[in-house]
Swiss-Prot record:
Gene3D superfamilies: 1.20.5.110, Longin domain. PROSITE patterns: LONGIN, V_SNARE. GO terms for cellular component: endoplasmic reticulum membrane; ER to Golgi transport vesicle membrane; Golgi membrane; SNARE complex. Residues 214 are vesicular. SMART domains: Longin. Residues 132-192 form the v-SNARE coiled-coil homology domain. The lineage of its organism: Eukaryota, Fungi, Dikarya, Ascomycota, Saccharomycotina. Residues 1-192 are cytoplasmic. Belongs to the synaptobrevin family. This is Protein transport protein SEC22.
Length: 214
């Protein structure tokens, strides 16, 4: 179940937060962790990730200097969580354009957006429609490729969300290895295919030369 939604500017300014009926102290603690997490972002941080935190999971998406975060109960389908965030992001961008970048913007300046958050959360929490949404989005979101980390490691053990440069370097290295292997395989294949033909051709030329010039 979706528990809470938070929208921040990537410099830490809170733009909007859902008004939640749940007064569980553990949920309030998750929101505090979110604020600390936002302060740890760097330009190299992953643009989307899942963070495990006790009985909850936090999913976030960074887009155009805005971070969209949803806190859900453990076990809530991850593809639905990211589909929900996509809906939230599209509506927020459509409703406010680039207003959030203005220096005069105050904290929670877009609190009226909670109306959309509440309606959309209700849809995604409805068991009768979750099955259809899950099936609809299963092929649209490559959630298996989204990084998953434990938030305690990020906040207290020095782990980082900055995987992008490491991932790019790894992909480049793997690409080089693959290219070298592919070149060797192609060369070996050509050799096995044409070496006998070349040898026969050379033998034939030698035979002609020997018969003509002996």
């Amino acid at each position: 179940m979706i528990k809470s939604t938070l929208i921040f500017r990537d410099d830490g300014l809170p733009l909007c937060s859902s008004v939640d009926d749940d007064t569980d102290p553990s949920l309030a603690d998750q929101k505090k962790k979110v604020k600390v997490l936002i302060s740890r972002f760097t330009p190299q941080s992953a643009n989307e990730a899942t963070l495990e935190s006790g009985a909850y999971e936090m999913h976030y998406v960074r887009q155009q200097s805005v971070v969209y975060i949803v806190i859900v109960e453990r076990g809530y389908p991850r593809n639905l969580a990211f589909a929900y965030l996509a809906d939230v992001r599209h509506e927020f961008e459509h409703s406010y354009g680039n207003e959030y970048v203005k220096p005069s913007v105050r904290p929670y300046a877009f609190v009226s957006f909670d109306n959309f958050l509440q309606k959309t959360k209700k849809i995604y929490n409805d068991k009768r429609v979750q099955g259809n949404l899950d099936q609809l989005n299963s092929d649209l979101l490559g959630v298996k490729q989204i990084m998953t980390k434990n938030i305690e490691d990020l906040l207290y053990r020095g782990d980082s969300l900055d995987r992008m440069s490491d991932l790019s370097a790894s992909l480049r290295q793997d690409s080089k290895k693959y290219r070298r292997s592919a070149q060797k395989i192609n060369f070996d294949l050509l050799l096995s295919q044409y070496a006998p033909v070349a040898l026969i051709g050379l033998f034939f030329l030698f035979l002609v030369w020997w018969l003509v010039f002996r």
